[in-house]
Amino acid sequence: MRVFSSIDELRHTLDALRRQGRTVGLVPTMGYLHAGHMELVSRARAENDIVVVSIFVNPLQFGPAEDLSKYPRDLERDAAMLRQAGVNFLFSPGVEDMYSRPMLTVVDVPDLGRELEGAVRPGHFAGVATVVCKLFNIVQPQTAYFGAKDYQQVVIIKRMVDDLALPVRLISVPTVRDSDGLALSSRNVYLSEAERRAAVIVPQTLDEAERLVADGLTDPVELEARLTAFLSREPLAKPEVVAVRDAATLQPVTSIADPVVVALFVRVGSTRLLDNRVVGSNRFVGNNRVAGGQSLPGKGVTR
C-alpha cells in the first residue's frame, strides 16, 4: 500500500492507472477506523481494481465548540488495518495540503443540510459537501462508498452529485453494529462504561419505531412523541433530534404510508450518537434504489 499526502502525486499516479483502464473506488473517512469502515473497504475491494481510502479530519465540518481537537486519531494503526485489507492507496493529507489558503468556495445543499443533524450543527453539512466534492475532484473515482449510519450525509452527497453532474456512483453500505445493536462509530470511544451501557437505548428506540409502525401507527407526529418518551427512560440520554421523514427526500411527511426514515441524534453524556432506520410498507424507494443504486438501509449488520 502506498501512502500519499500530496494531491498532485496522487493524481499523477491515478491518472496513469486510469489510462490503463483500471477502475477506482474511494472510501472517504476521518480515520480511527473500525469494522464499519472495513466493511466499506471490503465492498470497494470487491468492485474495483484500485481502492483509495482517504483519512482526513476535516476542520470545515466541525463547529467552534465541537470535538475537532480531541477527535481520535491513530494513523499508524489505521494504515496497518488498511494494508492488511488490501487497500492500494491511502491518502492522508494535512490541513495545509487540503486547504493551503482559506477556502472562499463552499459547496452547500441548504434545504437538506440545515435540517435534522444540520439544525443542531450549523455549517456541518456544508463542510462535509465541500470536502467530499474536493476529494471527488482529486481522486476522480468511478464509485464512492459511504456508511448508511450517516443517512442524511448520503442523501446530501447524492443530491450534490446529481446537481453538479459529478461522474461518480454512490454506494450506501448497511450500518455495522455491535452485538447489542449500537452502531459502530469512532466517537464511541468517548463513552464511559456507564454511558456505553446507556447508549443501547438508541438502537432500542429504532426497534420500538419499527414495532409501532408494524402495529399500524401512521401519524408521524405521534411516532416522534412516543419515541421521545421511549428515549426518556434512559436518564443519561438527551435526545436532540427525533424525526420521521420521507426516506428518499428527507422532507416532512403527514402520514406513514411510504417508507420513512426515523432519524435519531442523541447525546449520551458529552457524546452525540447518530442512528437511523427506514420503516414503512417496505424498505425501497423509487426503483428499489437510493444513494447511487443501493437499497435503503434497514437494521444493518451485527459485528
From Swiss-Prot:
Keywords: ATP-binding, Cytoplasm, Ligase, Nucleotide-binding, Pantothenate biosynthesis, Plasmid
Glycoprotein recorded as keyword: no
Primary location recorded for the protein, binned into one broad class: cytoplasm
BP terms from Gene Ontology: pantothenate biosynthetic process
Pathway it works in: Cofactor biosynthesis; (R)-pantothenate biosynthesis; (R)-pantothenate from (R)-pantoate and beta-alanine: step 1/1
Molecular function as annotated in GO: ATP binding; pantoate-beta-alanine ligase activity
Cellular component terms per the entry's GO annotation: cytosol
Annotated residues for binding of (R)-pantoate: Q61, Q153
Note: The reaction proceeds by a bi uni uni bi ping pong mechanism.
Function: Catalyzes the condensation of pantoate with beta-alanine in an ATP-dependent reaction via a pantoyl-adenylate intermediate.
Protein name: Pantothenate synthetase
Native species: Rhizobium johnstonii (strain DSM 114642 / LMG 32736 / 3841) (Rhizobium leguminosarum bv. viciae)
Gene for this chain: panC
